[in-house]
From Swiss-Prot:
It comes from Aedes aegypti. (6S)-NADPHX binds at N62, N63, G64, G65, D66, G131, F132, S133, F134, K135, P136, P137, D160. Binds 1 potassium ion per subunit. HAMAP family: NADHX_epimerase. Residues 9-219 form the YjeF N-terminal domain. It is an enzyme of class 5 (isomerase). Belongs to the NnrE/AIBP family. Keywords: Isomerase, Metal-binding, NAD, NADP, Nucleotide-binding, Potassium. InterPro entries: YjeF_N_dom, YjeF_N_dom_sf, YJEFN_prot_NAXE-like. This is NAD(P)H-hydrate epimerase. It holds the Pfam family YjeF_N. The lineage of its organism: Eukaryota, Metazoa, Ecdysozoa, Arthropoda, Hexapoda.
C-alpha cells in the first residue's frame, strides 16, 4: 500500500472533483460517515471502558467538515458529541453542516475548552482541525486548542492527519500530538509512518479503481459492506 506525499494527496483530491465529478458534499459525507463507523468500532462496544462523550474539534477547512459530519453520525450512534468549531466560513455547505448538528441537539461552540474541563468531561477527542494541505507552523489562533490536545490524557482520534504534523515528516517540536487512533482517508499519507503505538484505520470507500491504478495506491480490500479497513 502506498503512502501519499502532500502533492499526490492534493492531486488525487483534485481528480476526484474534476475528472470523476464528485462533489465536496459527497466526499465529505462519505469521509465523515466512515470516521464515525471507525470510532464506533474502536470505542463503542459494550466492553469499551471509554466514556461515550466525545469532543469533536473542527477546523475551518474540509477536514473540519469531515468532523462536523462525524459528530452528527456519532450522535445517531448514541455518542454524546460536543463540537468545538472556532473559525467558521460563509460557505453554505459548512453553515448547513453546523445547522444539522445543532438541530440534533449537538452543542457547537467557539470557546476553547480548558484542559481541566476536557479531562473531566470527555472520554474521547476527535481531532479534525487540519488536513493534508496544512503546512506548519500552527496559526496563533489555534495555539490554545493545540496546547490542550498536546497535554490531554484523553484518547485522541485524528482525522487523516494528526493536527500540527507535517504531512510528510510527521510530528513537529511545537505540535507533537500522539493520537490513540488515526483514520487515514482515501489513502494513508507519509506522516502515518511516524505513528507510535496507535491504531490505524483507512476510510473513504469511494476511490475509483482507475484512480487507484494511476497512483499505484494498492489499497487494501474493504470487506463486505464495511466503510473502513483496520490497518494496524
Amino acid at each position: 500500500m502506498k503512502y501519499l506525499n502532500q502533492h499526490e494527496a492534493i492531486s488525487v483530491d483534485e481528480e476526484l472533483f474534476n475528472e470523476y465529478k464528485f462533489s465536496v458534499d459527497q466526499l465529505m459525507e462519505l469521509a465523515g460517515l466512515s470516521c464515525a463507523h471507525v470510532i464506533n468500532d474502536c470505542y463503542g462496544s459494550p466492553q469499551s471502558t471509554v466514556k461515550r462523550k466525545v469532543l469533536v474539534c473542527c477546523g475551518p477547512g474540509n477536514n473540519g467538515g469531515d468532523g462536523l459530519v462525524a459528530a452528527r453520525h456519532l450522535k445517531l450512534m448514541n455518542f454524546d458529541a460536543h463540537v468545538y468549531y472556532p473559525k467558521r466560513t460563509e460557505k453554505d455547505l459548512f453553515i448547513n453542516l453546523q445547522h444539522q448538528c445543532e438541530s440534533m441537539g449537538i452543542t457547537v461552540s467557539k470557546d476553547c475548552p480548558t484542559l481541566e474541563w476536557v479531562e473531566g468531561e470527555f472520554g474521547l477527542i476527535v481531532d479534525a482541525l487540519f488536513g493534508f494541505s496544512f503546512k506548519p507552523p500552527v496559526r496563533e489562533s489555534f495555539a490554545p486548542i493545540m496546547d490542550v490536545l498536546n497535554k490531554s490524557k484523553v484518547p485522541i482520534v485524528s482525522v487523516d492527519i494528526p493536527s500540527g504534523w507535517h504531512v510528510e515528516e510527521g510530528p513537529q517540536d511545537e505540535c507533537n500530538i500522539q493520537p490513540d487512533c488515526l483514520i487515514s482517508l482515501t489513502a494513508p499519507k507519509l506522516c502515518a509512518k511516524k505513528l507510535t503505538n496507535a491504531k490505524h484505520y483507512l476510510g473513504g470507500r469511494f476511490v475509483p479503481p482507475k484512480l487507484q491504478d494511476k497512483y499505484a495506491m494498492e489499497l487494501p480490500t474493504y470487506e463486505g459492506n464495511n466503510l473502513f479497513v483496520k490497518l494496524s
